């Protein structure tokens, strides 16, 4: 398999984004991310609903990225051999739990020539297992039909790659991974060498944002709404005297806790009674400041402890304006080289999965995908 100029298909279905991307080496051929809006009315992501949405949307997105990359060619020979029939029967077994996807697959795939895809990089975890399985089974079905190898990718490694790809980083480095399901400090002694040195003991930071947004009566997803309100008053603060705790700020270790901060917001909101728009803005601003202060303090501590001068930040919460600016200021003042995902690639996407697959191919570190399974609780340092 080509190592440097491979065409790689990336597939990401770990939560509520259905995402596919095609790359040729470091060149992006196509990249589409579809966010499932159906969850907004429920204030959170329902795994089985996410699974159904992935199954409905994967094939149409796949068609689109093939067309965008000019890789969709009508098949020349339409003669169905016994071998072809056996392959399609195997596909039927792979996708038996996704009948809508199976129907779309059998209608479209036999009508096109095999595209020159060298490998399929797909998220194996962590994430919602029903959602992960749809992407994995789609990858397995394509691999079965076209005899293409699968590269299992850790979703959190994808977030690191989205910040680092195409750049030169010095090791040791520290990665701060902040998302709806994770708040982790990861020590990297080299590429693919990960050690989790700090993590949340309860709520992840993105989860805390969503829960506080719910307390304030804001729509889902809560992170952007909290940020919007906070930014509207940050410069003036409206004379607010609100003060929320900075959990585990001086705990002496590298761990986090955001459950108590969320509870403090709940008690404050109950004490204040009916919240005005200004109240909501001031609470959002103080909450965001508290989170940011803790994240910066813990990261500063781990960088000093391991004498690291490189900081990598990835995950959906890294799109937050206040958090980004705080870390940019911190890095500039402390001679730290900062790598942070662009806002467009901070949230879940398939481009980071494809690039992670490419990096593993180049380094001969690609894991076998023959026995790939969905692993909802997969750790970044787990090489199963």
What are these regions (language model features)?
Residues 1-4, 144, 148, 152-174, ...:
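Conserved phosphate-binding catalytic cores of ATP/NTP-utilizing and phosphoryl-transfer enzymes
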Residues 123-125, 142, 179-181, 311-320:
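Glycine-rich beta-strand-to-loop/alpha-helix junction loops that act as flexible
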């Amino acid at each position: 398999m080509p190592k440097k100029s491979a065409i790689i298909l990336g597939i990401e279905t770990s939560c509520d984004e259905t995402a596919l991307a095609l790359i040729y080496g470091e060149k992006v051929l196509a990249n589409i991310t579809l966010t499932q809006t159906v969850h907004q009315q429920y204030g959170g992501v329902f795994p089985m609903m996410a699974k159904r949405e992935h199954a409905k949307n994967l094939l149409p997105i796949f068609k689109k990225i093939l067309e965008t990359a000019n890789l969709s060619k009508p098949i020349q020979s339409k003669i169905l051999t016994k071998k072809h029939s056996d392959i399609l029967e195997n596909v039927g077994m792979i996708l038996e739990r996704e009948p809508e996807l199976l129907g779309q697959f059998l209608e479209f795939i036999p009508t096109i020539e095999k595209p020159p895809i060298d490998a399929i990089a797909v998220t194996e975890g962590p994430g919602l297992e029903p959602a992960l399985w749809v992407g994995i089974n789609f990858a397995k079905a394509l691999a079965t039909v076209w005899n293409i190898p699968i590269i299992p990718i850790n979703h959190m490694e994808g977030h690191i790659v989205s910040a680092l790809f195409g750049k030169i980083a010095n090791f040791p480095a520290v990665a701060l991974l902040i998302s709806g399901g994770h708040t982790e400090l990861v020590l990297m002694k080299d590429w693919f060498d990960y050690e989790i040195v700090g993590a949340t003991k309860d709520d992840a930071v993105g989860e805390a944002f969503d829960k506080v947004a719910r307390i304030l009566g804001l729509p889902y997803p809560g992170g952007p709404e909290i940020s919007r309100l906070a930014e509207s008053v940050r410069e003036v603060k409206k004379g607010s005297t609100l003060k929320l705790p900075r959990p585990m700020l001086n705990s002496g270790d590298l761990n986090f806790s955001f459950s108590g901060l969320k509870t403090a917001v709940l008690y404050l909101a109950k004490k204040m009674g009916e919240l005005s728009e200004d109240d909501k803005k001031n609470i959002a601003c103080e909450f965001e400041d508290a989170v940011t202060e803790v994240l910066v303090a813990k990261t500063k501590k781990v960088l000093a402890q391991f004498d690291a001068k490189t900081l990598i930040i990835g995950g959906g919460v890294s799109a937050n304006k206040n958090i980004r600016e705080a870390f940019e200021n911190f890095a500039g003042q402390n001679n730290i080289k900062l790598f942070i995902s662009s806002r467009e690639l901070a949230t879940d996407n398939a481009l980071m999965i494809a690039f992670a697959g490419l990096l593993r191919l180049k380094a001969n570190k690609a894991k076998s995908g023959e026995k790939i399974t969905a692993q909802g609780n997969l750790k970044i340092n787990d090489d199963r």
